[in-house]
């Protein structure tokens, strides 16, 4: 999986990759509807982030979407998802959800076919994807080899897609007749799934939340550089777009027909969510934080966080 080619404008994958990134910028890190966010995040895995995926599907065709997600997460597991991800609280919380996530639509169909069959038997049977993942993780915890890692990734992709299907069918993840329980369960499963999806996407993008591209007063030797001076020495690169002015300050806008804008790129684990929120306050309402492809001086590409104009761009959906 050569993720570096995703962001090269001369690549056939560029349009698909930037379309996925636009979804990520609009939804995945927003405070909007969590079910919609989950759909958009899964869209990025199934149809946006290209990888070397023989199961890729078009935007108007649902066939193969589950296989696409399973395949991409399997590849990500092999190449990018470390033991820290699998030992982390987000993955383990999803793994140990009780009761397990089951295929609501298949349970509904089986109950109609066999109305006298005990519901708990049907639910257990249709929890097979989640239960298989648990068994494979037990083996993975013992062996930690490549084969187990790929298998865990594939099954994790299937589980995430199952959550998506449950949401889409409207039944979601209900496990009882009580509406309050249903709402609590829906939100809990979606929250856990979305946390895992975000981490997978961040890994596939090269953890852009720990990179910051700057072009204005935060640059070295400029008046506000002290706010990020502890992040270390920057790399140098460029982004494609245009610069407008908001008062005395430049505002970047991502645009496919724009110019190469020079930027400094800082990479540091100090760019925590708390640190970025403080930078959000400093930048103010004229700017919004987003991900963008950056071209380095050696011709390679990486995705970085940048503060851009708080308006729709040519890449916006």
Residue ranges and their predicted role:
Residues 2-144:
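Helix-loop junctions and short alpha-helical segments
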Residues 43, 49-50, 172-174, 219-220, ...:
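Short, solvent-exposed loop/turn segments at secondary-structure junctions
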Residues 46, 50-53, 165-173, 198, ...:
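Charged/polar positions within long, soluble alpha-helices
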Residues 105-157, 164, 273-276, 280, ...:
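A charged, amphipathic interaction segment
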Residues 129-140, 154-165, 181-208:
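Amphipathic, Lys/Arg-enriched alpha-helical patches that create a basic surface
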Residues 170, 174-183, 224-227:
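Short conserved catalytic/interaction loops centered on acidic-Pro-aromatic/His motifs
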Residues 32-43, 89, 151-162, 185-196, ...:
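Short, well-structured alpha-helical interface segments that form or flank functional binding sites
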Residues 206-317:
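Glycine-aromatic micro-motifs
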